């Protein structure tokens, strides 16, 4: 009937036939059966019975023929419109559908000439009322059916509440700032101001009351005290606005999801190692295993291990680690164990069955521990084999020579162990990508030590995975909190916070430290006090490990929104913490913007060229604009333009490894901005300070994240000599920055983006080694005073006594209030004070002289890798004595003050009662020095409380020197004898 011009079904638009022979009203079979089931057997248009013969059949035939011949185009047009209407979904506007059906009804009515006479009282056709009534009933029936189906499929009320909660959490902030209580912070600030005032009055007294009988000692002491006051200001005021932060990992999951369909951003992990004999492969392997097992979608995690020593031992141990990871990773995720470094998990002295409900856990844990012990034996066998290098060099398993036999002259090497093309775990699940990287090294090329290795990893990862975020760890820092990456993403992926965040820094926490923390390895005062203070300004400094970077910030770009400019060139502490108006762009950014405009015009001109390929045009533009900054790699340059990460679509997967080898070649960085404005910055052995400083100068801010469970843990050098060498390297890096063009005293003023208190903290970071000079002089003063009988302070008046007492009280109260808001213990504070003196009179002094010699004579400073503890005995390394020249200055000061105390008491015994009063002040001064050096003295004594031979020889030598000096001074000669001798000298007897 459709071929003869009958339109589709008037109800649903499907293929129809003429249900009513009288008026040719079109209905499909389904709608006709539905009407019959509901008892409707009459036509909705004419009211006649469905299927009844037409009383005027001939006339009807003529009319139908007329419809076919005369109105075929009209019927076709209507058929088109109805077909389109039938394709509308049930959720579309019902008015549109009704209007289409009305048009169809009117068209059929006018053509057939039937029913126009059947109208109701209002003049509206009866058939139209019936059609609309029928349609409404049908819609109500469908709506009730849908409602019943939806109710059947609806989750329980509890699940609906949880879904609503998740939806609410998805729009909540992912983190918040927890300000320090005013009850704690206000008194703290008041005491700081009071201490500053008292310090000024104290200096006024000291300068205006010289000691003429000991003018040299007095002048030395005043200069030292002024420097200490300046150093205190640099250290104290950046702690003016301390804050705490809290993260909401559940909200992160609610917003971005979890699992394979998660919207979480990919993260590339960087692990760097140099010498596997000083950095045991088992420690590096535990770090890698903890990374592969983090609680994060596996397809979004990649681990890059940089072997800067090109050691086959590292390569083979990493291959063993990749195989063991196939068992370890699913075990960790199945039972949610913490930490996920097997060495530290199995060595925990806790109830490992707590909160475990799986019956198979004990059995699988026992089997896993056995597998790990077998894995350790294999690693130990590799280490034992590597102790003696063959004359012909190392040979790989396939019989070919190891390319890295010469660590100073070898090609670049990359090996992908796990990932999309690698093996899966034993449960059949995908594993994170694990990549071994050893950059090319050739004679005559600068390699820039760790900073150069990190920049090589930046380029390799950009070519292979190009995650928008980078998290770097030292080889001895394992992931202690499997949710650490999610903690960082709570800041990075929060739209209200993460736009201007260049990195999230986690505090360093350590295992294997003695209970008393003799050498302040935990560094609690810095990580729990200073870093919280900096977080309230522009953010914490970068400390070299445990830091999650935004990749675009490493490329030298500024933040999307620039920070405020100060109203004047001199800014007070109050304006440094407060937001201001949007800053103007610096000259460098204006130049960069102009370059972008030039590029846009170049793009416009290139588009005018006919048949010019889009990909070739973009590559040409990238090379013209970025090759001087990023180097000659089109794939890498294109990856830098992808702010959200991901491998460029134009990159050929088959050539990515070849491109990755190219970007780690030794000459790739020549004539580029790498190490100057891009990546880790060169010029100091402490590249971390310099890199973070450059980012803050560009206007970025950083975040300090302190989760309840420490994110990462590492090993610290608890041996005295190793600890001092570590401090020496840090101090040397600060001296190098101080003597370079990047010194915070004069660098970074152009854009005004570095807050003044933040600059003050960086100045303190690079100036503190120079405190060793006045500190050594000040520590020698009490012994000199005891030996000479003179003192640096004149007889105290009442006013002077008030200033001295006020200064001491303000120092004590400031420290107590600082402990109160930070939550650290008094023992940690005292250990920090002791090691400040120990490091200041030893490592810092050597760092100053080495840095000056490097600047004047061009002597290069050798980077010494801190050996990681491998002693099986608990705290075994603590008692090992390793002699080094760094120990000479503190040993000399210690012996000098001990000799001075003995000499002082001897002099008092011979001088009478009057000399005991001044003696107490001098002895207290000397005992203050000895108390601060007491941990150093214990370190010299060793495990058996016996002094090593070398120290005995030094002590005898120094004691002899000072004994001769003592005899020269003759403290036993009384004043009357001295007067007589001097009088006789004036006469010729």
From Swiss-Prot:
The organism's place on the tree of life at top rank: Eukaryota
Extracellular topological domain residue ranges = 206-213, 794-798, 857-884, 938-946
Please report any disulfide bonds recorded for this protein chain, giving both cysteine positions: none
Identify the gene encoding this protein.
Answer: CESA4
**Which pathway or pathways does this protein act in?**
Glycan metabolism; plant cellulose biosynthesis
| EC top class named in words | transferase
Give the classification, highest ranks.
Eukaryota, Viridiplantae, Streptophyta, Embryophyta, Tracheophyta
* Positions in the Cytoplasmic compartment: 1-184, 235-772, 820-835, 906-916, 968-989
Zn finger limits (RING-type): 9-47
Q: Which cofactor does it need?
A: Mn(2+); Zn(2+)
Q: What is this protein called?
A: Cellulose synthase A catalytic subunit 4 [UDP-forming]
Instruction: Determine if Transmembrane helix is one of this entry's keywords.
Output: yes
Taking the record's annotation, the residue ranges forming a coiled coil are: 362-389
Q: Which reaction does it catalyse?
A: [(1->4)-beta-D-glucosyl](n) + UDP-alpha-D-glucose = [(1->4)-beta-D-glucosyl](n+1) + UDP + H(+)
Residue stretches of biased makeup (Basic residues): 138-149
What InterPro entries has UniProt attached to this entry?
Cellulose_synth (IPR005150), Nucleotide-diphossugar_trans (IPR029044)
Annotated UDP-alpha-D-glucose binding sites? 272, 278-279, 308, 449
């Amino acid at each position: 009937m459709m071929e003869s011009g009958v339109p589709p079904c008037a109800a649903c638009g499907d293929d129809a036939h003429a249900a009513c022979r009288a008026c040719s009203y079109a209905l499909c079979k389904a709608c006709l059966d539905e009407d019959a089931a509901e008892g409707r057997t009459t036509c909705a248009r004419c009211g006649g019975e469905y299927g009844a013969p037409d009383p005027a059949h001939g006339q009807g035939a003529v009319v139908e023929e007329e419809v076919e011949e005369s109105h075929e185009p009209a019927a076709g047009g209507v058929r088109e419109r109805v077909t389109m209407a039938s394709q509308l979904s049930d959720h579309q506007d019902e008015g549109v559908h009704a209007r289409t059906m009305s048009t169809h009804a009117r068209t059929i009515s006018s053509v057939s000439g039937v029913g126009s006479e059947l109208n109701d009282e209002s003049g509206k056709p009866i058939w139209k009322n019936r059609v609309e009534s029928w349609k409404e009933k049908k819609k109500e029936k469908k709506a009730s059916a849908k409602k019943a189906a939806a109710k059947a499929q609806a989750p329980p009320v509890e699940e609906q509440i949880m879904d609503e909660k998740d939806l609410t959490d998805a729009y909540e902030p992912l983190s918040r700032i927890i300000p320090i209580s005013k009850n704690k912070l206000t008194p703290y600030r008041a005491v700081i101001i009071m201490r500053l005032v008292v310090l000024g009055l104290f200096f006024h007294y000291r300068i205006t009351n010289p000691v003429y009988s000991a003018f040299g000692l007095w002048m030395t002491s005043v200069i030292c005290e002024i420097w200490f006051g300046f150093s205190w200001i640099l250290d104290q005021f950046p702690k003016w606005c301390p804050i705490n932060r809290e993260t909401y990992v559940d909200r992160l999951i609610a917003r971005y999801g979890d699992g394979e369909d998660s919207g979480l951003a990919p993260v590339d992990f960087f692990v760097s190692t140099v010498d596997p004999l000083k950095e045991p492969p088992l420690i590096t392997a535990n770090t890698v295993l903890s990374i592969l097992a983090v609680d994060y979608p596996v397809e979004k995690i990649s681990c890059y291990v940089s072997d800067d020593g090109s050691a086959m031992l590292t390569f083979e141990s990493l291959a063993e680690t990749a195989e063991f990871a196939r068992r370890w990773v699913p075990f960790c995720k199945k039972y949610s164990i913490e930490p996920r470094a097997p060495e530290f998990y199995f060595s925990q002295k806790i109830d490992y069955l707590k909160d475990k409900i799986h019956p198979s856990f004990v059995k699988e844990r026992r089997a896993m521990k056995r597998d790990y012990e077998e894995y350790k034996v294999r690693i130990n066998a590799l280490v034992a084999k590597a102790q003696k290098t063959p004359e012909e060099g190392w040979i790989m398993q396939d019989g070919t020579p190891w390319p890295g036999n010469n660590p100073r002259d070898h090609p670049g090497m990359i090996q992908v162990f796990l990932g999309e093309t690698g093996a899966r775990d034993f449960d059949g699940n995908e594993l994170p990508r694990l990549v071994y990287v050893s950059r090319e090294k050739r004679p005559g090329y600068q390699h820039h030590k760790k900073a150069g290795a990190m920049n090589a990893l930046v380029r390799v990862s950009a070519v292979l995975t190009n995650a928008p975020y980078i998290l770097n760890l030292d080889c001895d820092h394992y992931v202690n909190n499997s949710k650490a990456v999610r903690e960082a993403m709570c800041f990075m992926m929060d739209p209200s916070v993460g736009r201007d965040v260049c990195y999230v820094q986690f505090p360093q926490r350590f295992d294997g430290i003695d209970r008393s923390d003799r050498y302040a390895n935990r560094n609690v005062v810095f990580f729990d006090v200073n870093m919280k203070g900096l977080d309230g300004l522009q953010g914490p400094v970068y400390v070299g490990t445990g830091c999650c970077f935004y990749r675009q910030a490493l490329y030298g770009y500024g933040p999307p929104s620039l920070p405020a400019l100060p109203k004047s060139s001199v800014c007070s502490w109050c304006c440094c913490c407060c937001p201001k108006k949007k800053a103007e762009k610096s000259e460098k950014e204006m130049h960069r913007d102009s370059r972008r405009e030039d590029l846009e015009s170049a793009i416009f001109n290139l588009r005018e060229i006919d048949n010019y390929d889009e990909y070739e045009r973009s590559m040409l533009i990238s090379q013209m604009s970025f090759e001087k900054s990023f180097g000659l790699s089109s794939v890498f340059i294109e990856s830098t333009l992808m702010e959200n990460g991901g491998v460029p679509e134009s990159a050929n997967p088959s050539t990515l490894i070849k491109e990755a080898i190219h970007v780690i070649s030794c000459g790739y960085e020549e004539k580029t901005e790498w190490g100057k404005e891009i990546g880790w910055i060169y010029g100091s052995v402490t590249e971390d300070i310099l890199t973070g400083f450059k980012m803050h100068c560009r206007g970025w801010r950083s975040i300090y994240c302190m989760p309840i469970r420490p994110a990462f843990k590492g090993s610290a050098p608890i041996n005295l000599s190793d600890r001092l060498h570590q401090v020496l390297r840090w101090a040397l890096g600060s001296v190098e920055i101080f003597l370079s063009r990047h010194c915070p005293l004069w660098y970074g003023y152009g854009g005004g983006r570095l807050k003044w208190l933040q600059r003050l903290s960086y100045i303190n970071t690079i100036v503190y080694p120079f405190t060793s000079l006045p500190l050594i002089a000040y520590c020698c003063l009490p012994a000199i005073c005891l030996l000479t009988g003179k003192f640096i302070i004149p007889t105290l008046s009442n006013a002077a006594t008030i200033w001295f007492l006020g200064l001491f009280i303000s120092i004590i109260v400031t420290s107590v209030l600082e402990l109160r808001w930070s939550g650290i213990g008094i023992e940690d504070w005292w250990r920090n004070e002791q090691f400040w003196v120990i490091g200041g009179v030893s490592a810092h002094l050597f760092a100053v002289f080495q840095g000056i010699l490097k600047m004047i004579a061009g002597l290069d400073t050798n980077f010494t890798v801190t050996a990681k503890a491998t002693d099986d005995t608990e705290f075994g390394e603590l008692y090992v004595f390793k002699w080094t020249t760094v120990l000479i200055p503190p040993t000399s000061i210690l012996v000098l003050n001990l000799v001075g105390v003995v000499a002082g008491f001897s002099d008092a015994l011979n001088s009478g009662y009057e000399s005991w009063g001044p003696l107490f002040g001098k002895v207290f001064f000397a005992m203050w020095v000895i108390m601060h050096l007491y941990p150093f003295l214990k370190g010299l004594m060793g495990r058996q409380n016996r002094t090593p031979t070398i120290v005995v020889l030094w002590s005898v030598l120094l004691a002899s020197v000072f004994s001769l000096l003592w005899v020269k001074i003759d403290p036993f000669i009384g004043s009357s004898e001295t007067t007589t001798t001097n009088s006789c000298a004036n006469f010729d007897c």
